[in-house]
Protein backbone atom coordinates (compact mmCIF):
# COMPACT_ATOMS: atom_id res chain seq x y z
CA UNK A 1 0.00 0.00 0.00
CA UNK A 2 1.23 3.50 -0.85
CA UNK A 3 1.28 6.34 1.68
CA UNK A 4 -1.50 8.25 -0.12
CA UNK A 5 -3.74 5.17 -0.06
CA UNK A 6 -3.03 4.59 3.64
CA UNK A 7 -3.87 8.23 4.41
CA UNK A 8 -7.13 8.00 2.46
CA UNK A 9 -8.09 4.80 4.26
CA UNK A 10 -7.43 6.35 7.68
CA UNK A 11 -9.33 9.54 6.80
CA UNK A 12 -12.33 7.49 5.66
CA UNK A 13 -12.21 5.37 8.81
CA UNK A 14 -12.11 8.55 10.94
CA UNK A 15 -15.25 9.90 9.27
CA UNK A 16 -13.75 12.52 6.96
CA UNK A 17 -16.35 13.15 4.25
CA UNK A 18 -14.56 15.84 2.24
CA UNK A 19 -11.09 17.26 1.83
CA UNK A 20 -10.25 20.77 0.71
CA UNK A 21 -7.34 20.97 -1.69
CA UNK A 22 -5.41 22.71 -4.38
CA UNK A 23 -5.30 20.32 -7.37
CA UNK A 24 -2.69 17.81 -8.33
CA UNK A 25 -1.68 16.51 -4.94
CA UNK A 26 -0.81 12.82 -4.61
CA UNK A 27 -3.69 12.36 -2.17
CA UNK A 28 -6.38 13.55 -4.63
CA UNK A 29 -6.84 10.25 -6.48
CA UNK A 30 -6.57 8.17 -3.32
CA UNK A 31 -9.24 10.08 -1.40
CA UNK A 32 -11.56 10.05 -4.40
CA UNK A 33 -11.17 6.27 -4.68
CA UNK A 34 -11.93 5.97 -0.94
CA UNK A 35 -15.20 7.88 -1.35
CA UNK A 36 -14.04 11.16 0.19
CA UNK A 37 -15.27 14.19 -1.73
CA UNK A 38 -12.46 16.49 -2.93
CA UNK A 39 -13.38 20.18 -2.88
CA UNK A 40 -10.96 22.08 -5.09
CA UNK A 41 -9.86 25.65 -4.41
CA UNK A 42 -7.98 27.94 -6.76
CA UNK A 43 -5.25 28.77 -4.25
CA UNK A 44 -3.79 27.02 -1.20
CA UNK A 45 -4.73 29.75 1.27
CA UNK A 46 -8.33 29.59 0.05
CA UNK A 47 -8.41 25.80 0.60
CA UNK A 48 -7.06 26.34 4.11
CA UNK A 49 -9.69 29.00 4.83
CA UNK A 50 -12.40 26.61 3.61
CA UNK A 51 -11.13 23.84 5.92
CA UNK A 52 -10.88 26.28 8.82
CA UNK A 53 -14.39 27.60 8.17
CA UNK A 54 -15.76 24.05 8.00
CA UNK A 55 -14.25 23.28 11.41
CA UNK A 56 -15.62 26.47 12.92
CA UNK A 57 -19.14 26.01 11.51
CA UNK A 58 -19.29 22.45 12.86
CA UNK A 59 -18.04 23.79 16.21
CA UNK A 60 -15.03 21.47 16.07
CA UNK A 61 -17.19 18.35 15.87
CA UNK A 62 -15.88 17.75 12.35
CA UNK A 63 -12.33 18.61 11.43
CA UNK A 64 -11.60 20.50 8.24
CA UNK A 65 -8.98 18.60 6.27
CA UNK A 66 -6.70 20.17 3.68
CA UNK A 67 -3.99 18.93 1.35
CA UNK A 68 -1.78 21.03 -0.90
CA UNK A 69 1.27 20.57 -3.05
CA UNK A 70 4.70 20.30 -1.51
CA UNK A 71 7.07 23.21 -0.98
CA UNK A 72 5.41 26.35 -2.39
CA UNK A 73 1.91 24.95 -1.78
CA UNK A 74 2.66 24.38 1.89
CA UNK A 75 4.34 27.77 2.08
CA UNK A 76 1.23 29.47 0.64
CA UNK A 77 -0.98 27.80 3.27
CA UNK A 78 1.35 28.69 6.16
CA UNK A 79 -0.38 31.89 7.33
CA UNK A 80 -3.81 30.26 7.29
CA UNK A 81 -2.61 27.26 9.28
CA UNK A 82 -0.97 29.59 11.80
CA UNK A 83 -4.22 31.56 12.10
CA UNK A 84 -6.28 28.39 12.70
CA UNK A 85 -3.77 27.26 15.34
CA UNK A 86 -3.85 30.64 17.08
CA UNK A 87 -7.66 30.55 17.16
CA UNK A 88 -7.74 26.90 18.33
CA UNK A 89 -9.63 25.87 15.21
CA UNK A 90 -8.99 22.16 14.52
CA UNK A 91 -7.59 21.68 11.01
CA UNK A 92 -5.79 18.63 9.67
CA UNK A 93 -3.13 19.81 7.21
CA UNK A 94 -1.56 17.26 4.85
CA UNK A 95 1.02 18.91 2.60
CA UNK A 96 2.24 16.78 -0.27
CA UNK A 97 5.59 15.12 0.03
CA UNK A 98 8.58 15.39 -2.20
CA UNK A 99 11.16 12.94 -3.39
CA UNK A 100 13.25 11.98 -0.37
CA UNK A 101 16.44 12.80 -2.27
CA UNK A 102 15.20 16.38 -2.74
CA UNK A 103 13.80 16.93 0.74
CA UNK A 104 15.31 19.99 2.36
CA UNK A 105 17.22 20.95 -0.77
CA UNK A 106 17.26 24.72 -1.31
CA UNK A 107 15.23 26.56 -2.48
CA UNK A 108 12.44 24.16 -1.46
CA UNK A 109 10.30 25.06 1.55
CA UNK A 110 10.71 22.32 4.15
CA UNK A 111 7.30 22.05 5.80
CA UNK A 112 8.08 19.97 8.89
CA UNK A 113 10.45 22.30 10.79
CA UNK A 114 8.51 25.39 9.72
CA UNK A 115 5.11 24.09 10.82
CA UNK A 116 6.28 22.78 14.20
CA UNK A 117 5.87 26.25 15.71
CA UNK A 118 2.35 26.77 14.34
CA UNK A 119 0.75 23.34 14.75
CA UNK A 120 0.06 20.87 17.51
CA UNK A 121 2.15 18.22 15.71
CA UNK A 122 4.23 18.10 12.52
CA UNK A 123 6.17 15.17 11.09
CA UNK A 124 7.05 13.53 7.80
CA UNK A 125 5.59 10.21 6.67
CA UNK A 126 8.05 8.13 4.70
CA UNK A 127 6.27 4.79 4.44
CA UNK A 128 2.70 3.54 4.69
CA UNK A 129 3.80 1.19 7.48
CA UNK A 130 4.59 4.18 9.69
CA UNK A 131 0.88 5.04 9.74
CA UNK A 132 -0.33 1.83 11.34
Which role does the model predict for each range below?
Residues 1-132:
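N-terminal alpha/beta PP-like core and its mobile active-site loop of ThDP/TPP-dependent enzymes
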